[in-house]
């Protein structure tokens, strides 16, 4: 009875953010996950779960595999590289698709549906640094135990960014001492708030105690400041005497740390139109120091095109002031709210019938592939939804089993709607 019904597109992405705890030796490119069930929740031991967005793939495959389900023509769009700039959605050829209604299954809160999202891009700031052979005491500094999280959805939680906090510690010791930067690495993804960061500095032997005390004092202040949002934050300093190694010159060490401190991070502006919605933000997700210099990778987001343009200019001008280079890639459009949406109206009505209450329709400060696909398919009507998934992009990620079952039944009712 669905021969004349309009087709529906089911959509999600198959890649995941691959985070793991420091003591996990799993190869995230090759090894499977060790799944755990604790009550109503499923998680992965020592790693991210990949419910974002493996659940969409699971939903779609289950529906396609079940011949007993009544539905119109279904089209399943499964993209790659969503977590690194939505490259799959940007590159996909949509000419074969016939559907004008798209159900995106990349949201993480049952009962909250998305009808609009921010646009954004990635930024890569590189600074060439000179190195010399230096001898002295090596202090290895490790910041760990931060909460982390998704750099869009959880940027408003006030959580510490390990990369930014490490640069703050280094700022306090470099400005008052002859310190050489030997290593600086933190974070794995530009769109995840980094939970850990490691740095190594070389100091004169007679300055060791003074510098160590300065590090510990800075760390103490940070722990007090972030006691609520990052209760498990810890800073460890290991000392190795009599080290002779290549390290960044004092002048360039100062310049690198000053650049990081000068560049913005976090919320830039709240929405003027929607209460409690972040309009513009950025996240310093990755820092890496190698033979050529230091590289900073940011994720930028905004629901206002002019604000994103201004933020890019700000990063560019600050970088150039420190003789660094800023590049921007992977820009994706914002998904604008559609005033008239039959799909949204149907989904609200079906949800109310099943749950006895209306769902919440929201905009989100994060990238959703709906914006890119809506720009490719004229007249596309999109809604994003999903089951309860908590702490995505972190090793604490966990998925509600009962919510997953309820939302599956909900999806079946949505696709059965003519």
Regions found by a protein language model. Name each.
Residues 33-47, 147-149, 352-357, 388-393:
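Glycine/charged-rich beta-loop-alpha catalytic/anionic-binding loops adjacent to active sites
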Residues 132-136, 155-185, 192, 205-281:
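Acidic-enriched catalytic cores of C-N bond-cleaving enzymes acting on peptides and small amides
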Residues 198-200, 234-247, 285-287, 295-305, ...:
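A short beta-alpha structural unit
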Residues 95, 159-176, 203-208, 254-261, ...:
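His/Asp/Glu-rich mid-to-C-terminal helical/loop segments that flank catalytic regions of hydrolases
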Residues 4-84, 89-91, 96-100, 122, ...:
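Active-site metal-coordination/substrate-binding segment of hydrolases
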Residues 272, 279-292, 299, 358-413:
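Zn-dependent metallopeptidase/amidohydrolase metal-coordination segment
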Residues 71-162, 170, 174:
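Fold-level recognition of mixed alpha/beta catalytic cores in primary-metabolism enzymes, strongest
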Residues 154, 161-164, 168-184, 337-380:
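Active-site-adjacent substrate-binding region
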């Amino acid at each position: 009875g669905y021969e004349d019904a309009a087709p529906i597109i089911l959509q999600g992405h198959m890649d995941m953010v691959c985070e793991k705890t420091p003591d996990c030796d799993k190869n995230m490119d090759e090894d499977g996950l060790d799944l755990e069930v604790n009550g109503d929740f499923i998680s992965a031991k020592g790693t991210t779960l990949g419910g974002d967005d493996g659940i969409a793939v699971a939903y779609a495959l289950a529906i396609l595999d079940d011949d007993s389900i009544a539905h119109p023509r279904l089209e399943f769009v499964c993209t790659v590289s969503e977590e690194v700039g939505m490259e799959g959605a940007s590159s996909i050829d949509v000419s074969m698709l016939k559907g004008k209604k798209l159900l995106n299954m990349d949201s993480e809160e049952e009962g909250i549906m998305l009808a609009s999202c921010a646009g954004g891009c990635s930024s890569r700031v590189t600074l060439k640094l000179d190195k010399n052979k230096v001898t002295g005491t090596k202090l290895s500094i490790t910041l760990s135990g931060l909460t982390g999280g998704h750099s869009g959805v959880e940027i408003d939680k006030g959580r510490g960014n390990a990369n930014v906090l490490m640069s703050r510690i280094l700022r306090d010791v470099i400005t008052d001492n002859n310190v050489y930067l030997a290593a600086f690495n933190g974070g794995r993804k530009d769109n995840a708030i980094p939970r850990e960061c490691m740095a190594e500095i070389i100091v004169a032997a007679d300055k060791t105690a003074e510098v160590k005390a300065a590090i510990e004092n800075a760390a103490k202040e940070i722990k007090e400041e972030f006691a609520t949002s990052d209760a498990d934050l810890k800073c460890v300093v290991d000392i190795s005497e009599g080290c002779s190694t290549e390290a960044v010159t004092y002048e360039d060490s100062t310049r690198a740390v000053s650049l990081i401190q000068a560049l913005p991070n976090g919320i830039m502006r709240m929405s003027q139109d929607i209460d409690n919605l972040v309009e513009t933000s950025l996240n310093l997700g990755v820092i890496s120091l190698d033979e050529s210099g230091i590289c900073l990778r940011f994720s930028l987001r905004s629901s206002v095109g002019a604000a994103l343009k201004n933020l890019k200019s700000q990063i560019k001008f600050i970088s150039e002031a420190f003789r660094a280079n800023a590049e921007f890639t992977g820009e994706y459009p914002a998904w604008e709210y559609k005033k008239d949406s039959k799909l949204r109206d149907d989904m609200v009505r079906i949800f109310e019938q099943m749950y006895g209450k209306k769902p919440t329709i929201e905009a989100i400060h994060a990238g959703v592939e709906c914006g890119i696909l809506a720009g490719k398919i004229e007249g596309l009507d999109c809604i994003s939804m999903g089951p309860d998934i908590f702490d995505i992009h972190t090793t604490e990620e966990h998925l509600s089993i009962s919510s997953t079952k309820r939302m599956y039944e909900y999806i079946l009712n949505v696709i059965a709607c003519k």
